[in-house]
């Protein structure tokens, strides 16, 4: 965790420095203005920590306001940084062309103020749209055929939510929309593939009751994500159970002879991927191969040793980058980063884009989703 935070704040601070230098070049402001801007940026760099401290001190409303401001700023400054890099590459291309062709393109290359405002306008537009998109919950439908579903059943509907990140930003309003969407598609089984909660639970304990409104014939199941461990695993588990979920921790459950649902803890519990693999290997011995088996695992990292046992793995974690084009970074760490994948030995993996948001309350070209998976009996 400490390495993660050090890396994050170094990158986040570097991005602020880049934007500060762009503003300085565009406006040639005096020392007083530069110090003021620098102080504001320093506050925004430290704001995520300030939000957590404010929340822990019991000032929920203040923490909620600060969270929305600082995380919206976080998204905005990342977007400004990316558009700034694109503009810099464009200017470099013009400069190089001028040198190669002996042409004077200095009027295009040197207009710092124009490019600053271009980046600013692009950032504002993306942020406004991104806040809107983050609230537009999309229902994704998926049909998987198998000969393992009993004839008399024919079809079973699994609904997946993931990465809701209940907390200061994702609250009652968003939970109501999620619950409404889930109820509308009438699941046989509801699963949560981790990161249901994101902060201290004093402020969100009452939200568990909304999930209790979802009734399914065969139950609700959940696994832990990394944020359950960051929040505090005991209290996160307590909240999840109050919400009506059965938490699968290295456990497999036979659902009336129709399907098997298995789940493993996120690797954050021990910090080693190998720990999760051991859990999967042990669970494999408990699975009936003649029955359709679904593995709930927060991170989309299929383990080769269990591919022959599980027919379908449901995961989340990646958010599909949440803000385009950050999925490019996500792809560096996760080969399967969003959507439906066919794995070796005929197994499948589905990676949910996330039902909520983490950090910035913004999504751009990566809308939140509730996934509806119909597992149907193959026609003879």
State where each predicted segment sits.
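Soluble catalytic domains of enzymes that build or remodel membrane lipids, polysaccharides, and related
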Residues: 145-380
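Non-catalytic terminal accessory segments
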Residues: 1-135, 380
């Amino acid at each position: 965790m400490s390495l993660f935070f050090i890396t994050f704040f170094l990158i986040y601070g570097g991005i602020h420095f880049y934007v500060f230098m762009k503003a300085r070049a565009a406006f040639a402001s005096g020392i007083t203005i530069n110090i003021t801007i620098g102080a504001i940026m320093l506050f925004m760099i430290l704001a995520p920590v300030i939000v957590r401290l404010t929340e822990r001190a019991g000032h929920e409303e203040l923490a909620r306001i600060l969270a929305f401001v600082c995380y919206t700023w976080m998204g905005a400054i990342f977007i400004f940084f990316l558009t700034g890099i694109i503009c810099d590459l464009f200017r470099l291309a013009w400069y190089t062309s001028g040198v190669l062709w002996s042409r004077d393109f200095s009027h295009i290359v040197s207009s710092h103020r124009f490019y600053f405002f271009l980046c600013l306008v692009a950032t504002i537009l993306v942020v406004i749209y991104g806040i809107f998109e983050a609230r537009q919950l999309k229902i994704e439908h998926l049909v998987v055929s198998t000969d393992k579903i009993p004839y008399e059943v024919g079809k079973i509907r699994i609904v997946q939510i993931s990465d809701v990140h209940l907390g200061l930003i994702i609250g009652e309003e968003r939970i109501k929309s999620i619950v409404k969407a889930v109820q509308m598609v009438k699941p046989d089984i509801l699963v949560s593939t981790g990161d249901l909660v994101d902060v201290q639970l004093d402020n969100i304990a009452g939200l568990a009751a909304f999930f209790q409104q979802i009734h399914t014939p065969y139950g609700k199941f959940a696994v832990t994500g990394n944020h359950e461990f960051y929040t505090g695993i005991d209290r996160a588990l307590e909240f999840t159970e109050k919400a009506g979920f059965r938490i699968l921790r290295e456990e497999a459950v036979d659902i009336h002879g129709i399907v098997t649902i298995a789940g493993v803890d996120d690797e954050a519990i021990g910090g080693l991927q190998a720990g999760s693999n051991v859990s999967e290997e042990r669970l494999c011995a408990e699975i009936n191969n003649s029955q359709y088996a679904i593995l709930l695992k927060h991170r989309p990292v299929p383990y080769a040793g269990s591919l022959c046992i599980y027919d379908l793995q449901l995961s989340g974690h990646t958010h599909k980058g949440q803000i385009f084009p950050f999925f490019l970074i996500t792809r560096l760490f996760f080969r399967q980063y969003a959507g439906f994948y066919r794995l070796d030995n005929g197994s499948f993996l589905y990676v949910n884009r996330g039902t909520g948001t983490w950090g910035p309350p913004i999504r751009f070209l990566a809308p939140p989703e509730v996934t509806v998976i119909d597992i149907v009996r193959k026609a003879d």
